[in-house]
């Protein structure tokens, strides 16, 4: 978002909502770029179009309190998606999100974590979420450049991408020591997922 009045922000999303039949996800990516979208704008959109048409992906800091504020200001109507790479998935789930939009590099971990949250398995929740959070913390140290560098590194490691090359310009390169820590955390996550699969078997 930019430093626009609430009325202009609402008008922008209204134009999109009127032009398409699909639901819209209003993403506040001000954790990376721009300024936060005011909660007043979000509430006006949900008042006008309802929760089936307008969903939200709040990423303005502090994410948890902002998520709760949107939930409360909309009287629980706002359908909210988590989008912090899994870093805040546990906290966000407990605040009432309806889903998450993960990156592909840790998708198996995010899915397993979501299932653990649904079944309220506290041991599995933290066994899985802690290595995810530690990996994302390493990504965050260099902002969007860090996210992309570690994401592509892991996608190559998993055999999904052939190259970790990124379009330039970018301001950060993944150094060998950070890569080694990512490897250690990724291995810990894989062990947690194997343990979780065994724990979910019947009998």
Predicted features along the sequence, with ranges:
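Active-site beta->alpha loop and helix N-cap motifs at the rims of alpha/beta catalytic domains
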Residues: 1-36, 170-171
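Helix-coil boundary/capping segments in enzymes
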Residues: 1-2, 77-81, 150-153, 170
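Short, solvent-exposed amphipathic alpha-helices that sit
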Residues: 11-12, 41, 150
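Catalytic alpha/beta core domains of metabolic enzymes, predominantly
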Residues: 19, 30-144
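C-terminal alpha-helical cap/extension of soluble enzyme domains
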Residues: 97, 105, 109-203
């Amino acid at each position: 978002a930019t430093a626009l009045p609430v009325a202009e922000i609402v008008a922008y999303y209204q134009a999109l909502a009127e032009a398409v039949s699909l639901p819209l996800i209003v993403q506040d990516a001000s954790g990376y770029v721009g300024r936060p979208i005011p909660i007043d704008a979000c509430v006006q959109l949900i008042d006008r179009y309802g929760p089936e048409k307008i969903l939200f992906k709040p990423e303005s800091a502090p994410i948890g309190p902002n998520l709760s504020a949107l939930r409360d200001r909309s009287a629980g109507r706002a359908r909210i998606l988590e989008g912090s790479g899994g870093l805040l998935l546990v906290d966000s789930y407990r605040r009432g999100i309806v889903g998450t939009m993960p990156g592909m590099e840790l998708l198996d971990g995010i899915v397993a974590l979501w299932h653990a949250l649904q079944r309220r398995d506290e041991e599995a929740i933290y066994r899985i979420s802690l290595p995810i959070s530690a990996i994302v913390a390493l990504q965050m140290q260099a902002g969007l450049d860090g996210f992309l560098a570690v994401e592509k590194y892991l996608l190559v490691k998993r055999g999904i991408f052939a190259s970790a090359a990124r379009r330039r310009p970018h301001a950060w390169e993944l150094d060998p020591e950070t890569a080694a820590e990512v490897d250690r955390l990724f291995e810990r996550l894989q062990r947690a997922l194997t343990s979780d699969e065994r724990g979910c078997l019947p009998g």
